[in-house]
Amino acid sequence: SGGMTIPPVAPDPAKLEPAPKCLDQPPAYFGPKAVMAGSVEEAVYVWASAWANRKPDQVAAFYSPQFRPAENGGATAYIEDRKQQVANGAAPDARLEDLKTKDAGPDRKVVTFVQRFGKDAYVKELTLAKDAQGWRIVAERTLQQL
């Protein structure tokens, strides 16, 4: 029985999906772990990324009006120093390591992580409080240099 062969049909070029664009960075689901939008972890990752990308005003926006520096001196001076450091100092890796969060009261969390600046690494602690703008830093300290 001589069956009829059907020639393959070439796809219509107009119906082809456009080639996917290359991403500047891997999708979020390849990150250290899935991070909920609006979560304290997301706020800390965005803060760290803004610093790594030298965006001083974006970094400064993460500090709450209630921010109190661990060192003596006012919050305004501390945030100005931080902006200078972000703009002109060593840029940290955008990726934070060993990020842990714990509750510190209603709408308040303490987040610890390792932040690397080239060969130097520091264990940092941020205390964040949730306000109308989202999670904002109310305290920041370096726990140790690794």
Which sequence ranges carry the predicted segments?
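Generic N-terminal initiation segments characterized by hydrophobic and/or small/turn-forming residues
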Residues: 13, 20, 93-96, 110, ...
